[in-house]
Amino acid sequence: MACPTRRGRQQPGFACEECRRRKARCDRVRPKCGFCTENELQCVFVDKRQQRGPIKGQITSMQSQLATLRWQLDRYLRHRPPPSITMAGELDEPPADIQTMLDDFDVQVAALKQDATATTTMSTSTALMPAPAISSKDAAPAGAGLSWPDPTWLDRQWQDVSSTSLVPPSDLTVSSATTLTDPLSFDLLNETPPPPSTTTTTSTTRRDSCTKVMLTDLIRAELDQLYFDRVHAFCPIIHRRRYFARVARDSHTPAQACLQFAMRTLAAAMSAHCHLSEHLYAETKALLETHSQTPATPRDKVPLEHIQAWLLLSHYELLRIGVHQAMLTAGRAFRLVQMARLSELDAGSDRQLSPPSSSPPSSLTLSPSGENAENFVDAEEGRRTFWLAYCFDRLLCLQNEWPLTLQEEMILTRLPSLEHNYQNNLPARTPFLTEAMAQTGQSTMSPFAECIIMATLHGRCMTHRRFYANSNSTASGSEFESGAATRDFCIRQNWLSNAVDRRVQMLQQVSSPAVDSDPMLLFTQTLGYRATMHLSDTVQQVSWRALASSPVDQQLLSPGATMSLSAAAYHQMASHAAGEIVRLAKAVPSLSPFKAHPFLPDTLACAATFLSTGSPDPTGGEGVQHLLRVLSELRDTHSLARDYLQGLSVQTQDEDHRQDTRWYCT
């Protein structure tokens, strides 16, 4: 016996609006249903319903596919012969069919977003915008409402585009050929692959152009070369062969893409392509911000390239923007350094393997055979990244006496090896910081390691000044002048002065041509002389200054010491140090402003300030004028030079007038 046909619970047709509002069962009788007739209500039927909004993930999927299509289009346009630098407004128009497809995508997604947030109130007189179509076979029926396109629609369009000379998405160089004003440009501006809806891909894309400028292969190659010719001298953290191997493979992780953008940004700032640096900076920062928003990773999984990119970006901001912005950006790099524990890279190594302090530095001593070349390069790159952050922390805080972030006492990472060893994969064991600072004799360490030691001494000088400049912070005035604080101050001051003088003498043994051609060595020597002036200023700031007549002074001097702890003696040493900075500054024009260390204007301005205010040397005015000329040559590439020139120009006007009057009288 056949089963009787079951009648559905829902009657055919649409319920009236009043029953829908009250969630009542409507009998769908026209022109007035039973419920409205019984309650004497106005019965309204709407035969044309608004389409439902997209389901979860459909908008994201369309955005992802559109971003991929834009990357394909840009790759297609970029392979055509462009001029050396092509602005976005000057690009040729894309093919008509591809541009129509992009416009159709924009309309579809914009309409879907509007439908998702629209109210449920519907009006029979509202006209719905029809979905534009690429061809007649894909066109929506006339008068039909806008809805999510057929899943096969994009596949058909993709096959049409893929039939051209475009390359697969996994081998793309991301760039924006058009001005993006829609919400879909978010992924492109952040330079990350579109987030997949259901699967995870390991392929990454990089972007070699920004929203307002496109870089040709020649420009990118030039920026890469400029980085190693000019920037690497004061930021020696990148392994040259590894980097160019990644460029040749054209495959990057997101962190490596961030690093590549940061390198080219800093290289553009130190070249005639400075007009490109602002656009590259904006793109680099957007890419780094996007990468920072990814889910947190374990501390040992922090990508080293991500830390390096933030460090290079902070150097760019110091060169082009200013100290305060550089400090904010560097703070993020310092925290990443701490999260990655780069200060403990050699915590498990045997400290007894390092040579004693009386022997020459061990930077040329080969490491055990168990450490191969690749492992050495990995460890050395981590060491150099940490020490670059360490130096940047101290040199940046020196500007305004800010507290240090990376503490010296917790460091268990060896000093960087020689550049020749690093670039040629020659393993070498270097000393720890405390061991290197105790060594005497001729230095055989790298210029980077010497800069680290001098920056460490400068950091100790800053701590020394902050601790004793205000006598009330440790003891009362009478207690400070006659108690243990006086003795402690003399011991620390004498130790720092001897340590700085010893390192300066070791650096003076380096040949003059090597110093003139090496921006790191030149800056390190000026930094040592600046530390001498810093110690002299510390003596001037304490509440007691007549230390030479104190009976405790001669007892505190070491047996081989030749300097006096009096303020006058320190002032004389500072005057000599300022004169040495003037002598070294004469090497800057031959060095080129494009290769000058970012913090070199600080040491030059410190010497100019000392010579213009408190130098007993009658030729100090000539030295000030020379330093001002050097700073004026650096102001186009170094923001510190511009800032110091504004203050020094006004400060030296009165001094020059008094100096001219004195010369006239004689």
Curated annotation (Swiss-Prot):
DNA-binding residues (ranges): 16-43
Knockout consequences: Leads to decreased production of asperfuranone.
Subcellular location: Nucleus
Biased composition annotated in UniProt, kind: Low complexity: 353-369
Keywords linked to the UniProt accession: DNA-binding, Metal-binding, Nucleus, Transcription, Transcription regulation, Zinc
Single GO biological process annotation from the record: positive regulation of transcription by RNA polymerase II
Any Gene Ontology CC annotation: nucleus
Upregulation: Expression is positively regulated by the secondary metabolism cross-pathway regulator scpR.
Location of the region described as Disordered in the Swiss-Prot/TrEMBL record: 184-206, 347-373
Gene Ontology MF term list: DNA-binding transcription factor activity, RNA polymerase II-specific; sequence-specific DNA binding; zinc ion binding
Cross-referenced InterPro entries: TF_fung, Transcription_factor_dom_fun, Zn2-C6_fun-type_DNA-bd_sf, Zn2Cys6_DnaBD
PANTHER family to which the protein is assigned, alphabetical: C6 FINGER DOMAIN TRANSCRIPTION FACTOR DBAA-RELATED, ZN(II)2CYS6 TRANSCRIPTION FACTOR (EUROFUNG)-RELATED
UniProt function note: Transcription factor that regulates the expression of the gene cluster that mediates the biosynthesis of asperfuranone, a probable antitumor agent.
Protein name (database record): Asperfuranone cluster transcription factor afoA
Lineage: Eukaryota, Fungi, Dikarya, Ascomycota, Pezizomycotina
